[in-house]
A protein has these predicted regions:
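Binding-site signature for planar aromatic cofactors or substrates
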Residues: 1-216
Length: 216
């Protein structure tokens, strides 16, 4: 029988920062980029980590953490295996959500939008920048699929590493970039007494963004 956990008394106050309407630019991508830069400068743990939420066509959700690689041309960009669970769900349902959480800064960004693959050329350019072992690992991992043992994947890795000694490691066709085009972005700043600052940007038909303060 599983052990019960009683966590009712675990809490803390948030009081280090605030967020007001005058702090908000017209384009939420500018604020998102600024917050990510501040997280990097503050040396928070994994400042570019982002939770990616996907769902099957019948609405069964799943989430996982990846590392953001760019905020480019109004899109959030990350890279992964197209045959992974998230890759298969994205192929069937192009609506996704992203959540950035920086505990040290008492901040969160939540993004909703649509997603598509980057071009092969864009994926090739990033893949060539990756460390050698990361490129080899991307080639041999049947991501999200059952494997018999740790030894199985390490043997595949060793064999592929020897195969490409002194040679360029090509990007596998089932690995590449994803670009998320946001339609809603919410910024959350922790405040005293759970009266947090929350602002929601929503993309309008003319391409502009409306801004609303939300109740905490």
């Amino acid at each position: 029988m599983s052990k019960d956990l009683h966590l009712e008394n675990i809490r803390r106050e948030y009081s280090s920062r605030s967020l007001s309407r005058k702090d908000l630019p017209k384009d939420p991508l500018d604020l998102a980029s600024s917050w990510i830069d501040q997280a990097i400068t503050a040396r928070v743990n994994e400042p570019t980590a982002v939770i990616v939420g996907t769902a099957t066509p019948d609405g069964r959700p799943s989430m996982r953490t990846v590392l953001l690689k760019e905020v480019l041309a109004g899109k959030f960009v990350f890279y992964s295996n197209y045959d992974s669970r998230k890759g298969r769900q994205i192929a069937a349902n192009h609506h996704v959500a992203l959540t950035f959480l920086w505990h040290e800064l008492e901040r969160q960004i939540h993004v909703e939008g649509t997603i598509k693959h980057l071009s092969p050329e864009e994926s090739d350019a990033y893949f060539a920048m990756r460390p050698y072992k990361s490129r080899v690992g991307a080639r041999i991992s049947p991501q999200s699929q059952p494997i018999p043992s740790r030894e199985y994947i390490m043997m595949r890795f060793a064999a592929e590493s020897l195969r490409f000694v002194g040679r360029e490691v090509p990007r596998p066709e089932n690995w590449g970039g994803f670009a998320v085009t946001p339609t809603r972005i919410e910024f959350w700043q922790g405040r005293d007494s759970r009266l947090h600052d929350r602002f929601l940007y929503e993309l309008e038909e003319d391409g502009s963004w409306s801004i609303h303060r939300l109740a905490p």
